[in-house]
Amino acid sequence: MNDTSFENCIKCTVCTTACPVSRVNPGYPGPKQAGPDGERLRLKDGALYDEALKYCINCKRCEVACPSDVKIGDIIQRARAKYDTTRPSLRNFVLSHTDLMGSVSTPFAPIVNTATSLKPVRQLLDAALKIDHRRTLPKYSFGTFRRWYRSVAAQQAQYKDQVAFFHGCFVNYNHPQLGKDLIKVLNAMGTGVQLLSKEKCCGVPLIANGFTDKARKQAITNVESIREAVGVKGIPVIATSSTCTFALRDEYPEVLNVDNKGLRDHIELATRWLWRKLDEGKTLPLKPLPLKVVYHTPCHMEKMGWTLYTLELLRNIPGLELTVLDSQCCGIAGTYGFKKENYPTSQAIGAPLFRQIEESGADLVVTDCETCKWQIEMSTSLRCEHPITLLAQALA
């Protein structure tokens, strides 16, 4: 990103109007002041860095709204990485090192899940680490997706058409069933699924919590693996997570300065890739699924402009009654909503969405983002699933 791109700002403040945090937290100066205006000051003197930038949730809604295409969110994230001299806390280490925590927790998932659901344990985490006791903590799977995949790797290799799956931390450590659902859907379309030779967390939690150098190292590892899949094997890379997809495509070059040139156009969200294949003439044997569902658009999905592909894909399911929520950010913003100081802001941001869901009369909520799923299931009475899971359920 050009460090002088803030000069394109015309001071219209439409970004502040679109900002979920500005609406509920008066302590945040807003994206215009935190981004373009603040950058002018920071370039003169780094001591003018404002700690309030930590309230930015990196939702990118300011960038979607900006008529001058100023990369406001990127400016803020880069400023935090460059000027914030605060040493990351143990809490931020625990929340951001998802590969480490997942590797340690999955072998003991039943014990870990039981412990973290106990009120005394959550009170202890609140007091010791400032992880808010009101936040429901994600559950771990007993065994990883990558380990399970070994049992089907030979079978997947038999398909003529292949894709590489960037599964991300959520599928690997928390919800392997989503990865299994994707394989089921792709196999039904005549496509086999490979995994990248090496995969690390996409880096978004690390960026958000002050571990930018670690995020950059992991990004380099992922880019090398993606380059092997795309350049050597000649197959595309798809992901089920909207945030992982966005990071691989856009955050790597814009925030981490990791070159993904020649790869970006070969990295796609699974729903978009599937829609394109159906549009090209491929078919899926889908049976009726008589459900009333509402779709929540994740922030990074909004930024990529790919919501329509997921919606059109879901409309291929017979009997499915689909309504798109008039929703903004759900408020969790990855690790942001787990932090004690952010919990009230997180829930206030999501409150309009929660009301819409409760008043919808729907059977189910659908979204492409795993942390949105956690927030919705904690804050409403409905279950939330990924679009791929609905497709898998509808397969005849």
From Swiss-Prot:
Pfam families listed in its UniProt record: CCG (PF02754), Fer4_8 (PF13183)
GO terms under cellular component: glycerol-3-phosphate dehydrogenase (FAD) complex; plasma membrane
GO MF terms held by the record: 4 iron, 4 sulfur cluster binding; glycerol-3-phosphate dehydrogenase (quinone) activity; iron-sulfur cluster binding; metal ion binding
Record domain 4Fe-4S ferredoxin-type: where: 2-29, 45-76
SUPFAM superfamilies hit by this protein: alpha-helical ferredoxin
Keyword set includes Iron-sulfur: yes
Description of how the protein assembles with itself and partners: Composed of a catalytic GlpA/B dimer and of GlpC.
Topology versus the membrane: Peripheral membrane protein
Task performed by this protein: Electron transfer protein; may also function as the membrane anchor for the GlpAB dimer.
Principal localisation: membrane
Record keywords: 4Fe-4S, Cell inner membrane, Cell membrane, Electron transport, Iron, Iron-sulfur, Membrane, Metal-binding, Repeat, Transport
PROSITE patterns the UniProt entry points to: 4FE4S_FER_1, 4FE4S_FER_2
Species of provenance: Escherichia coli (strain K12)
Ligand binding ([4Fe-4S] cluster 1): C9, C12, C15, C66
Protein name: Anaerobic glycerol-3-phosphate dehydrogenase subunit C
Superkingdom of this protein's organism: Bacteria
Keyword Membrane: yes
Gene: glpC
Taxonomic lineage: Bacteria, Pseudomonadati, Pseudomonadota, Gammaproteobacteria, Enterobacterales
Binding residues for [4Fe-4S] cluster 2: C19, C56, C59, C62
One BP annotation, GO: electron transport chain
Localization annotation: Cell inner membrane
Pathway: Polyol metabolism; glycerol degradation via glycerol kinase pathway; glycerone phosphate from sn-glycerol 3-phosphate (anaerobic route): step 1/1
